[in-house]
A protein has these predicted regions:
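Acidic/His-rich, metal-assisted hydrolase cores and their charged scaffolds
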Residues: 1-144
Length: 144
């Protein structure tokens, strides 16, 4: 090869006529076909499904009254998580306690920020699952 050219993923190389050179950029990487959709890993949801298959999903519904107090226990639905940890404790109960503790640790005045409440509960539930099981599930929190 009289004149080597260094190319990277996505570079379009012209070899002839004339001197070789990079002439354009093209899409590169993995492309997935999922059902009738073709796209990147993120576009077709493959990345999230991999995470779901590895660590499961937890949905938490929190209802606050007009004074921003907890109105009953939060509802928790766990999919793909074990029922109990190695000590035999119910993981959903551990996550419920963590959710309630997270809400109660926020001063009532700051509970008006529902995004703050949601993120606090999400982190607490995810942490409780990780302590009990060793994996961090995807956690979705609904606060009303």
């Amino acid at each position: 090869i009289p004149r080597p050219i260094q190319v990277r993923n996505g570079d379009m190389l012209r070899l002839a006529p004339g001197d070789p050179g990079i002439i354009d950029q093209v899409p590169h990487g993995r492309i997935f076909k999922d059902g009738r959709i073709i796209g990147t890993e993120d576009a077709v949801g493959v990345k999230d499904r991999r995470r779901l298959s590895f660590a499961g999903h937890v949905a938490v519904n929190v209802v606050l009254d007009d004074r921003y107090q907890i109105d009953g226990d939060p509802d928790i639905v766990a999919i793909g998580l074990p029922k109990a940890d190695q000590r035999g404790e119910n993981i959903e109960e551990l996550m419920l306690d963590a959710a309630i503790g997270a809400i109660e640790s926020i001063p009532r005045v700051r509970r008006k920020d529902l995004d703050l409440v949601s993120e606090s509960v999400r982190r607490a539930v995810r942490s409780a699952a990780n302590e009990a099981w060793g994996k961090k599930p995807i956690v979705t929190v609904f606060v009303t």
